[in-house]
């Protein structure tokens, strides 16, 4: 099991395990603490390019000030090459978006359509586009749609109700080593099949740096190595229960690819509970708003 599947196992469709949410609170009674509004909330939007001959497929500006440009013919979930999409931070100078490391972007509205003028190293490209209909604004949506910085992962492993491991770390290597030692100490270690997969996943990959959700239905996971970055789709399966569906295709969201979000003390908490026979693994990821 890869580390990405530990963080969002169903989201990435890398394993066919079943997960259950840990948040059973009444959403009407759960009060979200005030949280700072992302700097570019009013500018956030995704534009899909309508020119079939263009090399560009989509341009998105996120609430937290990141631009994501997807090239035509690229599969957003494919991270084997860093030329499939271009991403970085942006700022705004009057009506011009300054794209760090790339150039400038000017957006002009014309009726129901848009014209994007992209200036890259002095070369201008005119891109006709339509604006993606955003996920409706609401308390949970607006809270979620921002960039979150990974803080820590907490893993609890139980077998027949007995706690085998209970540990937390911001380091995947540290958590992997501690989990491996716990497995070795357990008298029925041969029964911990899924736990061993988790331990190997932690040993093979680092934790991500940040996770970004946008109103346009994009989620972006950034790693230290940009080639490991993930760019896919999300939407609410049930906004009242804060149940999120994930997919490599925006039309293929299902309850099999879902996780429940919880907001506590200005943090995003994502929890998964994997149960198979006598083995239970509870994984909780804590993220803070990225400044």
Over which residues does each language-model region extend?
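Positively charged n-region of N-terminal signal peptides that target proteins for export
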Residues: 1-5
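Sec-dependent N-terminal signal peptides
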Residues: 6-11
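Lipid interaction determinants
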Residues: 24-85, 93-233, 237-291
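C-terminal motif of bacterial Sec signal peptides marking the signal peptidase cleavage site
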Residues: 17-21
